[in-house]
């Protein structure tokens, strides 16, 4: 057991709690944006250790890079990160983003509602604009160019970001992972016009020509870890796409009536909505939690009964003895 005592010796450091919770300059900028969106920290930026000319290092540099251990309480939504358990489909999609030659090579970051990309490397794309860094961005064109090519942690805004939830007029059935991989890696795929589904929805034929309209936004009324409430106003029968993971245990209610959740675009959720105004509520209500709760309560009751009966057995002989002596 002595080896366990020395495990991770000097691995966990200590510092002032208030200083640990202070926001860096980059997180302050992200927090100032009131919209619903996610960030994405470039994989090489997350892993890379650099010597900053500004002298920034340690925890201060980690804050500016939005490393996972520093963004939890800041309520900044990250499209990637380190989790105890991860869905295979999610990991597959993130891997496509990581190996893509450029950030705009696919529609995946747009699809994941990524508005800002954190990167040390310059993103040379008309779809991305350098908007912030913890070091002031030079206004002089030549100095700005040098800054873009530096190793400073920079924030790029994605001009093609797609909303967290929106209405889509058409769908396409995909029957294999290879098909998904081919389509999702293609820049031609437009998630605002067509939703990729595993199966065709009842009463909603995929592939039929439908009148294409401009992107139909959806209002997010409430957003919590275990529930999301939306307001939808659709001019016709469409698919409501939600850039959230498809996962067992999630249920959806349209105007209080439970509906089917479809797996959409390989990883996310979609439902069919009728014309008109609707109140939509996604709710995490897994059977496994209810089963676990029932087992826990039953176990507590059985243990309580056991200990009560055991205590009564110990008291009984004493009572008999006292009565006999009276």
Please place each PLM-identified region on the residue numbering:
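Conserved luminal/periplasmic juxtamembrane motif of membrane-embedded glycan-processing enzymes
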Residues: 1-216, 223-229, 237, 241-245, ...
